[in-house]
Amino acid sequence: MSTQGPKQALFAQFAAIAKTLGHGHRLELLEQLAQGERTVEVLAERTRLSVANASQHLQHLRRAGLLKSRRQGKFVFYTLADDGILDVLTALRRIAERNVAEVERVVRSYFNKLDDLEPVTRKQLLKLIREGA
């Protein structure tokens, strides 16, 4: 029999979710799923994880109630359990950007590199693709 009160039980559940979120690969998988439903194979490819590794991380996220899954033939599709998960990811990013100097430096460096890119029209892009550039 547990001697934990309701408040402690509630915070223990919050901590379990936070622990599940405490892995970079899982956050990256959630970021991919924020863009829409994906299969394990697509998620593995986009995050450069093995299918087995991606599957294990996705199972952790699903057990924590952060994802829903459905099977279609031999494929398993994953999606975020609700929009609140996207809110959590956004809040984590904002907190990190405001309070962690290294995150701020990386973000600044990334966006400064975008300024070096040269815009192209659709027509120019198609020409570059045809030429293999």
Q: What are the functions of these language-model segments?
A:
Residues 62-72, 79:
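Beta-hairpin "wing" of winged helix-turn-helix
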